[in-house]
Amino acid sequence: KISNQSIKSINGLNRISSENIYSNYDYPSADNSSVDGFAVNAKDTHGISKKKFKRLKIVGSISAGSKPFKKFLKKDQAVEIMTGGILPRGTNSIIPIEKCSLIKDKINNYILIKQKFKKFENVRFKGSDFKKKDLLIKKNTLINSNHIMAFKALGVGNIKVKKKINIIFF
């Protein structure tokens, strides 16, 4: 019988898992943007047509990995958001940067929108890749690079694998 050993998950490539490995938490951990653009409430884009555009005031910026935006967005406001940025409260859709124009006046910055957007457009939902306690890898599975990436993203530190066996030829 081959015994088991605990190793760092990043060193698990081409090793055999000796136990089932589960996700420690939801991933992504919050609803976030799948594109660079502007977080808005989709209702603010209703009524837009080829002849009727809409202007939304930019009230902030969110980068991936930053803390959630503190303000609740009001009607006709937008927040610049990078891919992976957490959706601010009061928003439910992301307008890709290439689908709008930037406008500046002496005091404020705005985006000009020329089309409607649906609720949850360009949004990745909390847990859409992995839910907490999802099975990542079954016992006795050969660990590959995709598994290593999942372990890293989900904070899996150590894993149990089968010990390497030594074979000696004479």
Describe each model-derived feature in a short phrase.
Residues 160-170:
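Helix-rich terminal scaffold detector
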Residues 1-157:
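Phosphate-interaction motifs
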